[in-house]
A protein has these predicted regions:
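Short, conserved catalytic or interaction motifs in soluble domains
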Residues: 152, 188, 210
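A short, structured surface patch at a secondary-structure boundary
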Residues: 114-177, 219-227
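A hydrophobic, helix-centered structural microdomain
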Residues: 40-105, 141, 213, 218-233
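Hydrophobic alpha-helical segments characteristic of transmembrane helices
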Residues: 2, 8-9, 137-140, 184-187, ...
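Short, glycine-rich, amphipathic interfacial segments at transmembrane boundaries or analogous
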Residues: 12-13, 18-20, 81-123, 181-200
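Short beta-strand/loop motif that positions the catalytic acidic residue
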Residues: 205
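N-terminal hydrophobic signal-anchor/signal peptide
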Residues: 1-61
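Proline-centered helix-kink/hinge sites
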Residues: 9, 62, 78, 137, ...
Length: 233
């Protein structure tokens, strides 16, 4: 009497900050509190995105100019790396990043996952990845509405097609706009395997279910720590 009873998925979610994919049922995704967002939530998030991206571009412009010069000095090729990514509801957009790999890094191999100690990465690129400064041009993607500041990281369409066949509920992560940074990025180490993708999906589903301005601010603060202490990839 007076004791709250929770099912296992709910208890696991609260204890770990992620949703256990192996225990999910389609009905739970439909009826569980949190997955259906109101128009008010979407408007607030968009205002947050536009404000933060606008201020970020203005403040980061001198740093972005220095990064562009460093990339040009070290290696030939374009400063920006532009690549198709799967966005909200599977719509493909062009993602902008500072180039961190040598030019034509995938020539002869086709699309492959980045590795932790990737031999294709330049010295400047390695620093940019550790500090996540390579993501700064994506502020423009946020302003254009392709991305949100906070959300699941966008994957390449080729990887999405492959992963959705191997991981249950993988496409649920496309129900919101992808982000420059996200819950999975601040809670989980870098990984490039199917097992890593499952783990990151569990964090992404938690974010989607519990999406709020407070959670976005929490992720943003954690991301700032990653940038300051170079704890990225």
């Amino acid at each position: 009497r007076g004791i709250a009873v929770e099912d296992w998925p709910t208890f696991y979610e609260k204890a770990t900050g992620k949703i256990l994919v192996a225990e999910l049922r389609p009905s739970w995704l439909i009826f569980a509190d949190g997955f259906v967002k109101t128009a008010r939530t979407e408007v607030i998030k968009r205002l947050f995105d536009v404000t933060l991206a606008s201020v970020g571009l203005i403040l980061a412009f001198p740093l972005m100019a220095l990064v562009a010069i460093a990339i040009k000095i070290e290696s030939s090729g374009p400063v920006l790396f532009r690549q198709p990514r799967s966005g909200q509801n599977g719509c493909v957009f062009i993602l902008n990043k500072f180039r961190s790999m040598r030019q034509d890094a995938e020539e002869g191999t086709g699309p492959v996952w980045a590795q932790k100690a990737d031999p294709r990465v330049t010295r400047v690129g390695g620093f940019l990845r550790r500090t996540r400064l390579d993501e700064l041009p994506q502020l423009l993607n946020v302003l254009l509405g392709h991305m949100s500041f906070i959300g699941p990281r966008p994957e390449r369409p080729e990887f999405v097609q492959s992963l959705q066949k191997e991981i249950p509920y993988y496409m649920k992560r496309l129900s919101v706009k992808p982000g420059i940074t996200g819950w999975a990025q601040v809670k989980y180490r870098y990984g490039a395997s199917v097992e890593d993708s499952i783990e990151k999906l569990q964090y992404d589903l938690y974010y989607i279910k519990n999406l709020s301005l407070f959670l976005d601010l929490l992720i943003l603060l954690n991301t700032v720590q990653v940038v300051l202490f170079a704890r990225g990839r």
